[in-house]
């Protein structure tokens, strides 16, 4: 990796960490019901929403009711989006007169957006109407992100409270996440994107003159036979309320693009400045929630330890991705091609560094938006983002889900440390006993099972024409797909055709299970911890805010998360990389 790339990485991380600190403190005040700067503006609206919906925000819930209410809201969201997709052909705000969405794709999309995955088995600009994009997909971008934040806050309360069954009120946590955090940040980011040229309009499309006076003229079959193909007189450019959807798709670590090529499209991400702003938006809330955790638990050092582990892991994987994409393809050596970094599948306005750093950020978080085609990365350049997903989306991770995922790994870390010293493990003053260990094991083991079992199933019975490349890279496409869907990321090796019934239904099942079969054990863990006494730290207690704990946590994440996938990675990207040197 050259020094310029290193400077970019360090600058990005510095800005991210500086911005995350005040946001994390602000979020802690929001969730603790303390006065904050937005109270005068949003307080009356919050109370009005409670009155209209009949919610008693002062009534707290135990973990079972919290989980039941959360599941009910998300189930309703899935059904609503599915119906909206199927009926969009007869609904307003459809200037391109797009028909209803295929039922298999509609199911996949409804589950995808409700689970914060945003896997897209469709081309946004040619499949979804403006109404579907706004009322269906954008609304789920807010609600799915707020759901993850609410669950994370419930787990924090479980660690902070003592001898109680109450974890808070889901409706209040959801509402405050949207009103006080997601909406203001999205509004500011959308304005910045509009300033940089991202459209925000209800106009369906516009026609424009070609810059090239004679584009796309087909070549003649023979020099003596002139071509009869005529270039179109105008080019058609699809528009829509793009800026508002891009803002929440990044801030909520959703990732679903308004256009088919996502943030590689010049109307979603037109300049290097928007590229930086959107990358910061992807990781901002996940990083900030670490500070929120420290404040709410009463020991800011605990949050800093979690943030340090996340940042060290991200910096390492980002550096590896940058290094892999900064070297020329070995197969081009010796044939007169200049030894320059590969720009295949990348936008020139972002270059290799901007594309590789985005790839690391979008897969570290459960975001999945792309500004370059990961399928065109070098074998190792594509493997490191894939491995970031396979770690369980805990390296910053999704909004809320990244924090509660890393806290689960922290529980496993103190359990392992307790085994080594022969005493009952503790975390934040709470004893970690068999029930907590079982819930943590469920959360950690389900995503790898979904990834590996889904890939095996696709290799055996999946449609053969879905894979565009034979050999190791074709296997990598399938492994990447289920690693993405099984960890609620949503990015893809785009050479995979994922519109068949097998891929849409299998993907929907993987996304559903990896979201809710993890959230329920996390809430059960929170409920169990909330009922425990908080113990004073003794001489044999492992400090969970120091460098030793951070190092142990990183090792546990790498050993438990990464080693699970070594055999599969050996069949895919590693084999492909070795083949380049033959």
Curated annotation (Swiss-Prot):
Report the locations given in the UniProt record.
Cell inner membrane
MF term (GO), any = P-type potassium transmembrane transporter activity
Assigned GO CC terms: plasma membrane
Q: Which Pfam families does the protein's record reference?
A: KdpA
The record's section on InterPro entries has:
KdpA (IPR004623)
Do the record's keywords include DNA-binding? no
Primary place of residence? membrane
* Topology in membrane: Multi-pass membrane protein
What UniProt keywords are attached to this protein's entry?
A: Cell inner membrane, Cell membrane, Ion transport, Membrane, Potassium, Potassium transport, Transmembrane, Transmembrane helix, Transport
Q: Where do the coiled-coil regions begin and end?
A: none
The transmembrane residues are 6-26, 65-85, 87-107, 136-156, 178-198, 277-297, 304-324, 402-422, 441-461, 505-525, 546-566
Functionally, this protein is described as follows: Part of the high-affinity ATP-driven potassium transport (or Kdp) system, which catalyzes the hydrolysis of ATP coupled with the electrogenic transport of potassium into the cytoplasm. This subunit binds the periplasmic potassium ions and delivers the ions to the membrane domain of KdpB through an intramembrane tunnel.
Q: How does it assemble?
A: The system is composed of three essential subunits: KdpA, KdpB and KdpC.
Q: Which family does it belong to?
A: Belongs to the KdpA family.
Q: What is this protein called?
A: Potassium-transporting ATPase potassium-binding subunit
- The record lists the organism as Solidesulfovibrio magneticus (strain ATCC 700980 / DSM 13731 / RS-1)
Q: Which gene encodes it?
A: kdpA
């Amino acid at each position: 990796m050259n020094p310029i790339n290193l400077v970019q990485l360090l600058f990005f991380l510095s800005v991210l960490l500086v911005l995350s600190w005040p946001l994390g403190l602000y979020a802690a005040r929001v969730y603790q019901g303390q006065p904050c700067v937005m109270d005068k503006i949003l307080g009356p609206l919050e109370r009005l929403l409670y009155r209209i919906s009949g919610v008693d925000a002062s009534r707290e819930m135990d973990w079972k009711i919290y989980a039941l209410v959360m599941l009910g809201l998300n189930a309703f969201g899935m059904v609503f989006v599915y119906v909206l997709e199927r009926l969009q052909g007869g609904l307003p705000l459809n200037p391109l007169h797009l028909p209803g969405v295929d039922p298999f794709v509609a199911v996949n999309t409804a589950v995808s957006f409700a689970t914060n995955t945003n896997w897209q088995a469709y081309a946004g600009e040619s499949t979804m109407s403006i109404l579907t994009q706004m009322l269906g997909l954008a609304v789920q971008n807010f609600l799915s992100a707020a759901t993850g934040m609410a669950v994370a806050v419930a787990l924090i309360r479980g660690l902070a409270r003592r001898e109680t069954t109450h974890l808070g009120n889901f409706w209040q946590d959801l509402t405050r996440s949207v009103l006080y955090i997601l909406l203001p940040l999205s509004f500011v980011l959308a304005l910045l994107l509009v300033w940089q040229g991202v459209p925000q309009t209800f106009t369906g499309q516009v026609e424009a003159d070609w810059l090239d006076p004679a584009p796309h003229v087909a070549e003649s079959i023979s020099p003596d036979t002139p071509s009869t193909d005529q270039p179109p007189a105008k080019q058609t450019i699809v528009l829509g309320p793009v800026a508002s959807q891009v803002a929440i798709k990044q801030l909520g670590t959703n990732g679903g693009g308004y256009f088919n090529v996502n943030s590689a499209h010049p109307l979603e991400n037109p300049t290097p400045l928007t590229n930086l702003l959107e990358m910061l938006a992807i990781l901002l809330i996940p990083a900030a929630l670490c500070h929120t955790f420290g404040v709410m638990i009463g020991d800011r050092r605990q949050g800093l330890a979690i943030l340090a582990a996340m940042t060290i892991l991200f910096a390492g994987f980002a550096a590896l991705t940058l290094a892999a994409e900064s070297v020329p393809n070995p197969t081009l050596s010796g044939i007169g091609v200049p030894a320059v970094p590969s720009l295949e599948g990348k936008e020139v306005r972002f270059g290799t560094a901007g594309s590789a750093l985005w790839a690391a950020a979008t897969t570290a978080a459960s975001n999945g938006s792309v500004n370059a085609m990961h399928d065109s990365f070098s074998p190792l350049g594509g493997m490191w983002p894939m491995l970031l997903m396979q770690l369980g989306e805990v390296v910053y991770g999704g909004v809320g889900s990244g924090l509660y995922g890393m806290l689960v790994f922290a529980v496993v870390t103190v359990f392992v440390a307790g085994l080594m010293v022969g005493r009952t493990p503790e975390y934040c003053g709470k004893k970690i006993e068999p029930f907590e260990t079982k819930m943590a094991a469920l959360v950690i083991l389900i995503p790898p099972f979904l990834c590996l079992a889904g890939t095996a199933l696709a290799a055996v019975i999946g449609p053969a024409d879905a894979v565009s490349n034979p050999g190791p890279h074709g296997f990598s496409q399938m492994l990447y797909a289920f690693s993405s869907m099984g960890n609620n990321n949503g990015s893809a090796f785009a050479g995979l055709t994922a519109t068949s019934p097998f891929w849409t239904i299998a993907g929907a099942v993987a996304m559903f299970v990896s979201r809710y079969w993890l959230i329920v054990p996390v809430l059960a863990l929170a409920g169990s911890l909330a009922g425990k006494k908080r113990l004073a730290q003794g001489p044999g207690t492992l400090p969970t805010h120091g460098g030793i704990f951070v190092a142990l946590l990183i090792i546990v994440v790498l050993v438990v998360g990464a080693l699970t996938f070594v055999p599969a990675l050996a069949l895919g990207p590693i084999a492909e990389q070795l083949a380049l040197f033959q």
